[in-house]
């Protein structure tokens, strides 16, 4: 699939599209799961997952850790980045998520479970972007 001349831009576009799909799913499902969720939270999550897709797309050029010198394949890179980004999200909106989780089946669980969700989403985004476009230095050698 060639949307752009650059392989890196193609990877970023594919990853953003997959992130947008996850964001749209969350946009639809959040009010079903969390009755008190407002429209601002829904749009924030939509844009958040699109941003995670862009971030994972850009980071696809790194398939070897620059400092620790070990392989950084998609099945490590995607979950790490998705989990890290959702960790940051939980730090920003911990109180809001805790409040929303009180009256649901998730009552009593920690909002930090969103990190696991981010790892799964990150894995899927990076898997699809890597299978469709590739990763590593070949992305910048056009």
Locate each region found by the language model.
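Juxtamembrane/disordered regions of integral membrane proteins
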Residues: 1-142
């Amino acid at each position: 699939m060639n949307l752009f001349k650059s392989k890196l831009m193609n990877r970023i576009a594919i990853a953003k599209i997959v992130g947008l799909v996850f964001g749209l799913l969350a946009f639809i499902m959040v009010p079903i799961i969390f009755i008190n969720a407002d429209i601002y939270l829904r749009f924030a999550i939509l844009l958040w997952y699109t941003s995670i897709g862009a971030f994972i797309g850009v980071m696809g050029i790194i398939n070897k850790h620059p400092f620790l010198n070990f392989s950084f394949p998609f099945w490590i890179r995607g979950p790490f980045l998705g989990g890290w980004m959702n960790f940051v999200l939980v730090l920003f909106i911990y109180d809001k998520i805790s409040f929303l989780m009180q009256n649901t089946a998730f009552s009593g669980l920690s909002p930090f479970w969103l990190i696991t969700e981010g790892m799964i989403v990150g894995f899927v985004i990076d898997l699809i972007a890597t299978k469709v476009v590739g990763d590593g230095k070949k992305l910048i050698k056009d």
